């Protein structure tokens, strides 16, 4: 439903001046924004709210924080990379002393291509109409798998590092070769036929 009904980044991302003022301008103009933020003095607006939004696993350089089952109740300092959708949710749930925009990219919102959404709708119709129908188990599983794959194809890791096997080192048989991550990305990029950002925004929309 998200991929059929919601809007996604549809133009190449443009690098914007990393300022709070420019971020607000981009969001007022309805741009899809990807940002890296530094936040100081974070705290919940409503301390009895039972489901804090920011996951501890997604922040970096976090200091002086209170962790509630993997979620941030407060923090003295941290960095995080989020979308404009995430930012709006965080702004409703939290207050902070200061916020610095370290990096900012913007794209234009639009609907996903009709051929893609038509495939999603067809698989969804098949999945829901075949569920529980005697003798249709195989077709139900196939339709369900197809439906899941449309998201999966947008969420492939864009940086596939080479894996090395060293039979002479039993304690470290497998290791990732990270000597040239940019080269690995460029080698893998031709296989990414659906934009990775569509997968990012799919999950962001579901969190609203």
Please state what every model-predicted region is:
Residues 1-208:
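Conserved acidic
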